[in-house]
Amino acid sequence: MYLHSKLQEYDGTINIAFIGCGKFISMFLSQYNQLKKIKIDTIVDLDIKRAKSNCIKSGLKKETIEQIHFSNSLNDVLDRNIDIFIEATGNPLVGTQHACKVIQSKKNIIMVNVEADVLCGKYLSDLAKENNVIYSMAYGDQPSLIVEQIEWARLNGFFVTCAGKGTKYHPIFEYSTPKNVWDNYGITPEEAKKARMNPKMFNSFVTGDKSSIEMAAVVNASGLKCPNNGLTYPAVNVYDIANKLIPKDNGGLIDCEGQVEAISSIDIKKNQIKNDLRWGIYIVIKAQNNYVKACFKEYGMVTDNSGEYSAIWRPYHYVGLELAQSIYSIALDKKSTGYTKFFNADVISVAKKDLISGEILDGEGGFASRGRLITSKDSVEGNFLPLGL
C-alpha cells in the first residue's frame, strides 16, 4: 500500500496528456472515473473525432470530455501544464520524434510505444537523464511487468535463469497478414471491428513481431540475454515452466542461464495446451544453495525435477487498465516502471515474401516483413534493417 498511502497524502493534481488514443489508452480511459488526482489535460491524435468517440465508448463523462484539450499537433501543447505525456501511437519513427520533443521540453514520458523504445530506447533514456525527467515503460504491457518480477528476484538474491511471456504462436503464423489475422488470432472479424482492434497491430501479436519487440525491450532493460537463434516459442504450461525453461545442459530447452524466451499456448498441431500462459508473464529463478532448495520443497513451490529451479508467473496482464501504476510511480515516487538501460538486443526485418526493388516495407504486423530478435552486436555487424525502420 506504499504508493496508495502516498496518493492519499498527495494534495496536488497529476496532469497528463496522451499522444495517440487507440485501444491501449481507451482501456485506461475506462478506469479513469475511479482514479484519484489524475487529470487528463490533453489528447493529441490525428483523428480528433475518433479520439472523442473512443472517450465516449470508454465511459468518460460528457463534462470530463468537454474539459479535455484536443489537438492534432504535439507542438501546440508542449507548453501546457502537463506533468506526464503518454506516447501511444505505436509508430516507431513518429514516436521517437514525439519522445525527443517531450523530453527536451522537460516533461516526463511513458512509452506505451514499445516499438520506438526498442528502436531508440537507450538514446531516449539517456536524453531523459540529461534533461532530469523520467522515461518509463508502460505498466500493464508485459515488458514492464516482467522487469518488475526480475527486480523482485534480484533484490531478494535469486539468480534469474529465464524470463518472458506467453503468446499464441505457430510457425505458419509468421506469414499471417492483416487480411487473415482474425482467423489466426481466434476471433471473428465482426468481434474485432466492434472492439476497434487494429488488424495490423494485432497481426503483430500473431506473427511473433510483438513478442520479439517486447522481449528485446526486456533484454535492454534488464541485461538478460537473447536466445542464440531468436525466440523459439516452445509450448509450455505453467506447471512445467521450471522444468523446461532452464538450460539444455540441465535438461531444459533454453540456450543458457539468464536469457529471455516466449512460450506458446498452442502445440504444433494448433491444439491449445492445458494451463497455458497466453496472456501472462513468468520468470524462472535458481536456488543458490541446498538450504534454498529445501525451502522450495518445504513450502510447496513449483520446481524442476532437481528442485534447483523454481518459477513464478502472472496469468494475465491487464494492458491499459493498469497504466495508472506508471503514472502514480512517476508523479508520487519519481520512479519509472522500467526503462531501457542497454542496447543489447534488436529486432530485425525478415522478408515474408519475395520483395521487388523499391517496395516499401510496412513494418510489424504487415504484409512484407516480420521481426526476429537478435543481439545488437549481430544486428550491427550484419548491417540488418531494424523492423522499426
Where do the language-model regions lie?
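C-terminal catalytic/substrate-binding lobe primarily of soluble NAD(P)-dependent oxidoreductases
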Residues: 1-7, 184, 188-389
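Short, ordered loop/turn segments at secondary-structure junctions
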Residues: 46-48, 90, 114-117, 140-141, ...
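Rossmann-fold NAD(P)-binding glycine/threonine-rich loop
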Residues: 94-101, 105, 113-133, 138-141, ...
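Conserved N-terminal Rossmann-fold NAD(P) cofactor-binding segment
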Residues: 47-80
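Rossmann-fold NAD(P) dinucleotide-binding segment
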Residues: 76-88, 92-111
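N-terminal Rossmann-like dinucleotide-binding module
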Residues: 1-58
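Rossmann-like NAD(P)H-binding beta-loop-alpha module
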Residues: 136-206
